[in-house]
UniProtKB/Swiss-Prot annotation:
Belongs to the sirtuin family. Class III subfamily. Its main location: mitochondrion. It is found in: Mitochondrion; Cytoplasm, Cytosol; Nucleus. GO terms for biological process: negative regulation of reactive oxygen species metabolic process; peptidyl-lysine demalonylation; peptidyl-lysine desuccinylation; protein demalonylation; protein desuccinylation; regulation of ketone biosynthetic process; response to ischemia. It catalyses: N(6)-malonyl-L-lysyl-[protein] + NAD(+) + H2O = 2''-O-malonyl-ADP-D-ribose + nicotinamide + L-lysyl-[protein]; N(6)-succinyl-L-lysyl-[protein] + NAD(+) + H2O = 2''-O-succinyl-ADP-D-ribose + nicotinamide + L-lysyl-[protein]; N(6)-glutaryl-L-lysyl-[protein] + NAD(+) + H2O = 2''-O-glutaryl-ADP-D-ribose + nicotinamide + L-lysyl-[protein]. The keyword Oxidoreductase does not apply. NAD-dependent lysine demalonylase, desuccinylase and deglutarylase that specifically removes malonyl, succinyl and glutaryl groups on target proteins. Activates CPS1 and contributes to the regulation of blood ammonia levels during prolonged fasting: acts by mediating desuccinylation and deglutarylation of CPS1, thereby increasing CPS1 activity in response to elevated NAD levels during fasting. Activates SOD1 by mediating its desuccinylation, leading to reduced reactive oxygen species. Activates SHMT2 by mediating its desuccinylation. This is NAD-dependent protein deacylase sirtuin-5, mitochondrial.
Amino acid sequence: MRPLQIVPSRLISQLYCGLKPPASTRNQICLKMARPSSSMADFRKLFAKAKHIVIMSGAGVSAESGVPTFRGAGGYWRKWQAQDLATPLAFAHNPSRVWEFYHYRREVMGSKEPNAGHRAIAECETRLGKQGRRVVVITQNIDELHRKAGTKNLLEIHGSLFKTRCTSCGVVAENYKSPICPALSGKGAPEPGTQDASIPIEKLPRCEEAGCGGLLRPHVVWFGENLDPAILEEVDRELAHCDLCLVVGTSSVVYPAAMFAPQVAARGVPVAEFNTETTPATNRFRFHFQGPCGTTLPEALARHENETVS
């Protein structure tokens, strides 16, 4: 991967539209800045005045709700990590296995609820909206927990577990069926010794559009695929107009999303990172608050005594 470059917002969708897996640390080149502040009081002063807040969220937010991340040493489904299965090639080679993986993830979400971090974001959006201020969430997560918490201004740049896309006619549809098809009932167990179900392709989820019946796939962005240009245009607009940015629970290593916050910081907008650890981008930002997002976000986004009302 080439060195990180700062580009005008209008060029992001042209240069960094393909989802790429994490690069090695030595290939992540970040400009060094002063150590970020951890002063909540200073952050809160900026928060009280901000008119247009962008919150970018990643897997770390949902991990606190018990959602598997499929990353790191223990992040396996059977013997595979997400980047082994979340590819067009994997689906073409073994659609049954890929559907088992996503069926498991869909079923797991039935028992998961938004945590304090999700709720703090949703409450902040509602409260500030009544003051004529804008809060928008740009999330890499596909679990819909932000939506479940009540977030309205939401850009799900990597898609959703609960949407499907037909590989024949291209129709995208919401799908909350459990199981998504009879053949997947009871399938998808994550334990390493579990054998593939090897479901015949004709019994996998099929399109219900009249006269189609094509094979459905999860409506998520897989590694090697481009993000939706229309969504990227919306992202560009939000990044160009925001006056405060929060980066919440994201590792800042999956592109193109890893590019967004550094680009905002490069034009002088305060960026605050909320994470359980530092990331390759930490020193690009004004603030860094270390700890669980469910602990740090409620304090950061609570009503401020000096909140400006339009």
